[in-house]
Design a protein with these regions (language model features):
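Residues lining the SAM
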Residues: 99-102, 128
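Short N-terminal helix/helix-N-cap motif within the alpha/beta-hydrolase-1
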Residues: 106-110, 137
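A short glycine-rich, Lys/Arg-flanked "PGG" loop and its adjoining helix->strand segment in the class I
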Residues: 109-124
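Alpha/beta-hydrolase-fold catalytic nucleophile elbow
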Residues: 128-130, 181
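Short, glycine-/aromatic-enriched active-site segment of Class I SAM-dependent methyltransferases
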Residues: 130-155, 166
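Short alpha-helix
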Residues: 155-172, 178
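Conserved catalytic loop of SAM-dependent methyltransferase domains
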Residues: 176-222, 252-255
Length: 272
């Protein structure tokens, strides 16, 4: 049996990403004829998993290097874009998945305006972002560990739900439902893994990618960390079990937020 791609191998040993994909797949509603844009496809893993459920997918990212990496997994329909103008015709997509992308772009309002423009009149937006607020204490720990927003490629820490409600309403969207995941234990484990990779295993990475450099970002980097990954695989069951303690924190919100919204209008004041 052929070895799974490095992206899939990382996913199989992930924590937050597994929870995210589970939520996305649980709420996935695709028709065979749907045209879907994955805006911010990164190295292609989530596109790869979701497109197996149907529809015609286009995969877009700011970074050419990300697209080169994703092409091995996705093979076709990859487009380089920018955040302020999407190179697609108006009303050309039935759904847009914008997953962990909005926090990476300077002009997030313009990005939402462009998403509205390219969606059909009954189009849907699936948006995933980091969630922030007064009680998200681990956000305050990152600077103490020497971890900056720029290490993640972030332009901002994240968003509050109320903030996104206002932004989406301004750009002609109505939130249908939302869910959060990655509570304290999952986020703490993820933070420690990011710290180990950035500060110990691979502290001198110079390549600046849209989504930072908090883990292996290419097959070459993954191969360089093969022994570390094998060691991590041994302790992964324990880390996964610890992350499930999040279920005990039923009153807390998660550090990651997913929103499902529908387009209800094309505002006249929307920037083009």
């Amino acid at each position: 049996m052929a070895e799974a791609s490095w992206q899939v191998q990382l996913f199989q040993r992930s924590i937050k990403k597994k929870d995210k994909v589970r939520l996305l797949q649980k709420n996935l509603c695709l028709k065979p004829e749907d045209k879907i844009l994955d805006l911010g496809c990164a190295q292609g893993l989530i596109s790869y998993l979701l497109q197996q459920k149907g529809g015609f997918w286009i995969h877009a990212d700011l970074d050419y290097q990300n697209l080169l990496t994703a092409r091995v997994l996705l093979q076709r329909n990859l487009v380089q874009t920018d955040s302020s103008h999407l190179p697609f015709l108006s009303a050309s997509f039935d759904q847009v998945f914008c997953l962990d992308y909005l926090e990476h772009v300077e002009e997030d309002e313009m990005c939402l305006a462009e998403i509205n423009r390219i969606l059909t009149s009954q189009g849907r937006l699936v948006l995933a972002v980091p969630q922030t607020g007064s009680f998200f204490l681990l956000h305050r720990v990152k600077p103490l560990l020497g971890i900056k927003l720029s290490d993640y490629g972030h332009k901002r820490e994240g968003y509050r739900l109320s903030q996104l409600q206002a932004m989406l309403a301004h750009h002609g969207f109505e939130i249908e439902k939302h869910a959060s995941f990655a509570k304290f234990f999952s986020e703490l484990i993820e933070l420690l893994l990011n710290f180990i990779y950035m500060k110990i295993l691979s502290p001198r990475k110079k390549v600046q990618l849209r989504d930072g450099h908090i883990r292996p970002m290419s097959a070459k980097e993954f191969d360089q960390q093969k022994k570390s990954f094998q060691l991590y695989s041994l302790v992964y069951p324990l880390l996964w079990g610890l992350s499930r303690l999040d279920k005990l924190l039923f009153w807390l919100k998660g550090y990651s937020l997913i929103i499902w919204a529908k387009k209800i209008s094309s505002p006249e004041n929307q920037q083009k």
